[in-house]
Amino acid sequence: MEDGPVFYGFKNIFITMFATFFFFKLLIKVFLALLTHFYIVKGNRKEAARIAEEIYGGISDCWADRSPLHEAAAQGRLLALKTLIAQGVNVNLVTINRVSSLHEACLGGHVACAKALLENGAHVNGVTVHGATPLFNACCSGSAACVNVLLEFGAKAQLEVHLASPIHEAVKRGHRECMEILLANNVNIDHEVPQLGTPLYVACTYQRVDCVKKLLELGASVDHGQWLDTPLHAAARQSNVEVIHLLTDYGANLKRRNAQGKSALDLAAPKSSVEQALLLREGPPALSQLCRLCVRKCLGRACHQAIHKLHLPEPLERFLLYQ
């Protein structure tokens, strides 16, 4: 019993020493990170690289902060970029976040700079620490020209699930032309990303009507969204009635329930135009609508092209094509 206080005294000393050591180590990490930033701002690349090596371990030999080549690419200064390349600057220099000059050129939509970099050996599928490729950046900026050039040089149109998806980014921002180019290059129109869902689901979430319409025209599954959440669920949470009409015209199931057991109608704001639109579509569809859906289902995803080959009367053809 007499040793009790001594034991607890030593225990408290040990805990205090451990906590002090932990916070001291954390303070050093923070200090080194701030010092790295200081050297980057001052332009001392070698010292910044050395400090980054200490913090992050095995950094590639091709590491650099935002170099003059990055700046030229980001600002679309083609002559300056070509001059730097001619002087022997490595086109694959990357920042601490693995951002290359090609990433910068594509994010700015500077197709001439992107092409010059690619012609001089830039990695077309380089990935940043955030999982972004140059193609993702091109879709982010909405540069269809950059998207075409990247694909011409071998960019992967559809990437692994853990990487940022170019088509989802294009749809999210309403860049329909970029979306169509990717789909023409065999990207799965119903590709589901765990945190985002399918391209159609994203289009409905962000109310990109043009993208919703085009995806449905090209055969996107009208009920495939994010797990049990359908595109109609996503649209019901928003305020765009046109998206509701498009989805229901293409046969969206109003009775489908999500993981919480809710239908699209349950998610619509009370007494809103979206709720009214869903209520109006709850009844049995017209026979003509059922026939149209049946014909399109039989023709499959390529029905948009197949319908033209049936040589139907123009009014009927236009009806089947939702025109």
UniProtKB/Swiss-Prot annotation:
A single BP term in Gene Ontology: proteasome-mediated ubiquitin-dependent protein catabolic process
GO cellular component: Cul5-RING ubiquitin ligase complex; cytosol; endoplasmic reticulum
Reported function: Substrate-recognition component of a cullin-5-RING E3 ubiquitin-protein ligase complex (ECS complex, also named CRL5 complex), which mediates the ubiquitination and subsequent proteasomal degradation of target proteins, such as BIK, DIRAS2 and RPN1. The ECS(ASB11) complex acts as a regulator of the endoplasmic reticulum unfolded protein response by mediating ubiquitination and degradation of BIK.
Protein source organism: Homo sapiens
Superkingdom: Eukaryota
Domain SOCS box: 273-323
Pathway: Protein modification; protein ubiquitination
Localization per Swiss-Prot or TrEMBL: Endoplasmic reticulum
UniProt subunit comment: Substrate-recognition component of the ECS(ASB11) complex, composed of ASB11, CUL5, ELOB, ELOC and RNF7/RBX2.
Cited InterPro entries: Ankyrin-SOCS_box_domain, Ankyrin_rpt, Ankyrin_rpt-contain_sf, ASB9/11_SOCS, SOCS_box, SOCS_box-like_dom_sf
Induction (free text): Expression is induced by XBP1 in response to endoplasmic reticulum stress.
Similarity section: Belongs to the ankyrin SOCS box (ASB) family.
Signal peptide extent: none
Keywords: ANK repeat, Endoplasmic reticulum, Repeat, Ubl conjugation pathway
ANK repeats: 64-93, 97-126, 130-159, 162-191, 195-224, 227-256
Name of the protein described by the UniProt record: Ankyrin repeat and SOCS box protein 11
Gene: ASB11
Record GO terms (molecular function): ubiquitin-like ligase-substrate adaptor activity
PROSITE patterns in the record: ANK_REP_REGION (PS50297), ANK_REPEAT (PS50088), SOCS (PS50225)
One Pfam family hit: SOCS_box
